[in-house]
UniProtKB/Swiss-Prot annotation:
It comes from the Bacteria. It comes from Campylobacter jejuni subsp. jejuni serotype O:2 (strain ATCC 700819 / NCTC 11168). InterPro entries: Mn/Fe_SOD, Mn/Fe_SOD_BS, Mn/Fe_SOD_C, Mn/Fe_SOD_N, Mn/Fe_SOD_N_sf, SOD_C_sf. Its EC number is 1.15.1.1. Destroys superoxide anion radicals which are normally produced within the cells and which are toxic to biological systems. This is Superoxide dismutase [Fe].
Length: 220
């Protein structure tokens, strides 16, 4: 059975990006509901005792939706970090040299990467996610937009960064202003986590996805 992961930071430490109230609903209620639903759906089925990624890749319907949303939310919450308090909007953050070189090779510059990321995430219609992934088939970085619970790991693409654009992720703090939320998100990206995800993607490919998920949700 799966458990709701603990967040690795103080939910009061995100300034005007996200409030503790948002975390209480997003993590404490929405994310928790996906975990609870998944446990109820897989009990006494062929999915009981399987690891999270295996369930995602071999299921459909309600089981898939809830399993994928557990993973998607886990990853999103690791992609953000608290405010630095410097007021720079994230410009003072250092990015791993290998990751920066890969981003500049694929997108031209970090400025262009940011512009394309925010444009792509703004353009996701309705509820969904916007990802930076490592494509294991062509060994390139690319953007992927997914709707509802869909996740790129079903296409053998390794997530490196994701932003949640379901309205419950930002409505308490930003109402319907998704672009404003995305600007704040970019200033709170946990680049150390993204760099580590990229490093493991290069070393282990899709195996890195299972390693990450199993660290949070060991099979019991």
């Amino acid at each position: 059975m799966f458990e709701l992961r603990k967040l690795p930071y103080d939910t009061n430490a995100f300034g005007d990006f996200l409030s503790a109230e948002t975390f209480s609903y997003h993590h404490g209620k929405h994310h928790n509901t996906y975990v609870t639903n998944l446990n109820n759906l897989i009990k006494d089925t062929e999915f009981a005792g399987k690891d999270l990624v295996s369930i995602i890749k071999t299921s459909n319907g309600g089981v898939f939706n809830n399993a994928a949303q557990v993973y998607n939310h886990d990853f999103y919450f690791d992609c953000i970090k608290p405010s630095t308090g410097c007021g720079c909007g994230g410009s003072c953050q250092s990015i791993d040299a290998n990751l920066q070189a890969a981003l500049e090779k694929e997108f031209g510059s970090l400025e262009n990467f940011k512009a394309e990321f925010i444009k792509g995430a703004t353009g996701v219609f309705g509820s969904g996610w916007f990802w930076l992934v490592y494509n294991t088939k062509n060994q390139k970085l690319e953007f992927v937009g997914t709707s509802n619970a869909a996740t790129p790991i079903t296409e053998d693409k390794v997530p490196l960064l994701v932003v949640d654009v379901w309205e419950h992720a930002y409505y308490v703090d930003h109402r319907n202003a998704r672009p404003a939320y995305l600007e704040k998100f970019y200033a709170h990206i946990n680049w150390e986590f993204v760099a580590k995800a990229y490093e493991w993607a290069l070393k282990e490919g899709m195996g890195s996805v299972s390693f990450y998920a199993n660290e949070l949700h060991p099979v019991k």
